[in-house]
Amino acid sequence: MGQPLGIIAVLCLLWVSIMLTIGFCEHYESDEQLADIYSSECRSFISDEKYSIRNMTTGKTTIDGIDWLFAADAYTDSLVVYSKNFKRGYFDRYTGVNVIPAQYTHAWIFSEGLAAVVLNNKVGFIDHQGKTVIDFQFPYAKDNKKQVGLVFHDGYSSMYDATGKCGIINKKGEWVLKPSYEYIQNPQYGKRVFYDGKMYGVLDDSLHVLLPAEY
């Protein structure tokens, strides 16, 4: 009598073990994976092609359903751009806090304390609190071939006017170089390459023509 009971007990344990293994595998297959580490407290995870941000100290997810976000090593500002439901916002890379909720149709990285964002097809600049510093007065150029980053360097940023011409503005939103070029690239070693529609030239760090458009 004892032997059949022993066999039944072994079979029961085997069944439980199999069920636990199946459950573990199903959980593992559907579980999220670590995507990136932004700081000791803030990490991103991916599951079903969607990202989430989590504060590792509290264990709480601060943002979920993210479509894409900047990599941790893409730049070093405290706020990171993310996209959710076709809108852009910013989270704090150190805490994971959703500082500026997703509300803009386009957004660039923060540089020198400001970031370009787009609302109603107009470009403006905000600070780290989401406050508008430069009004939404510039038309958004949809020509992706130009690949011009609307990012401040040394107090200046490339910008387009209503005619589609590119110039340079300062942090007050004032034109310091009138828009007359097809595009002006972000500076490399203080020099900016410009294109006038036919030839390329170079501006120096004072925005004077260093090399005329002859190349």
Where are these regions (language model features)?
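N-terminal Sec-pathway targeting helices
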Residues: 1-11
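Bacterial N-terminal signal peptides
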Residues: 11-17
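Residue-level detector of conserved, function-critical positions
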Residues: 21-215
